[in-house]
């Protein structure tokens, strides 16, 4: 299990680097996302979906964690970290830069990540799997449009032609 987790960690870092995403370890990652172009975040989000659904190693890891979370506390924690609470908290930290409250940031994280998480299962059950990624793409585009409409930066960091995500 430790080798599987290490391989997953390596794949995560490599994918984040390939899509030029801010590093996840430093305290300033949420601030760094504020300056990441929307196109990169969109592409990375779609790549994450492909990672968890189409890449055999990662998809099998996800399925294993989904099943085994109910049998083994260690696997339940891994499921939480990789697929449930971990991504949700990560996104809430990013959205906290836009909102007035932690609750509002968490709601935005749920609004963004909830459909993605659901679509993992939709993908698994779909006879025509190629129909699922376009649903996620449409969700992400609508979410971005909503964020860009409702939330504005203050001062020098106003949106510039829709090039920034948050």
Regions from the PLM with identified roles:
Residues 13, 17-20, 24, 53, ...:
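Short, flexible helix-adjacent loops and helix caps
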């Amino acid at each position: 299990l430790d080798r599987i987790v290490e391989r997953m960690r390596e794949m995560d870092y490599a994918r984040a680097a390939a899509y030029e995403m801010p590093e996840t370890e430093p305290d300033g990652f949420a601030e760094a996302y504020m300056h990441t172009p929307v196109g990169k975040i969109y592409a990375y989000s779609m790549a994450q979906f492909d990672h968890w659904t189409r890449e055999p190693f990662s998809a099998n890891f996800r399925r294993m964690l989904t099943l085994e979370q109910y049998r083994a506390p260690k696997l339940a924690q891994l499921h939480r970290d990789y697929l449930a609470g971990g991504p949700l908290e990560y996104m809430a930290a990013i959205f906290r830069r836009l909102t007035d409250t932690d609750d509002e940031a968490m709601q935005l994280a749920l609004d963004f990540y909830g459909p993605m998480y659901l679509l993992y299962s939709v993908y698994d059950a779909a006879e025509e799997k190629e129909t699922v990624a376009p649903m996620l793409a449409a969700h992400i585009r609508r979410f971005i449009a909503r964020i860009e409409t409702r939330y504005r930066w203050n001062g020098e960091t106003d949106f510039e032609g829709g090039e920034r995500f948050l």
